[in-house]
Amino acid sequence: MKKITWIILLLLAAIILAACQANYIHDVQGGTVSPSSSAELTGLATQ
């Protein structure tokens, strides 16, 4: 059971990192900075 939970945690971390990277690329290309749900999840919006 522990191996399954580790796989799920790794998948969640990868999804959050990918979403933040996509938002960062979008912000750089568009020039607009808007707080997104993924940024709030990782705590970037509060900084």
Swiss-Prot record:
Q: Does the keyword Transport apply?
A: no
What membrane topology does the UniProt entry give?
A: Lipid-anchor
**UniProt keyword annotation of Chaperone present:** no
| Name of a matching Pfam family | Lysis_col
Q: Lipid attachment of type S-diacylglycerol cysteine occurs at which residues?
A: C20
Q: Where is the signal peptide?
A: 1-19
Q: Which InterPro entries match?
A: Lysis_col (IPR003059)
Q: Where is the lipid attached (N-palmitoyl cysteine)?
A: C20
Instruction: Report one GO cellular component.
Output: cell outer membrane
Q: What is its main location?
A: membrane
Q: Where on the tree of life does the source sit, at the highest rank?
A: Bacteria
Q: List where in the cell it is found.
A: Cell outer membrane
**What are the record keywords, sorted?**
Cell outer membrane, Lipoprotein, Membrane, Palmitate, Plasmid, Signal
The record ties this protein, via PROSITE patterns, to: PROKAR_LIPOPROTEIN
Which GO terms of type biological process are on file? cytolysis
Function (record text): Lysis proteins are required for both colicin release and partial cell lysis.
Question: What protein name is recorded for this chain?
Answer: Lysis protein for colicin E5
What organism does this protein naturally occur in?
Answer: Escherichia coli
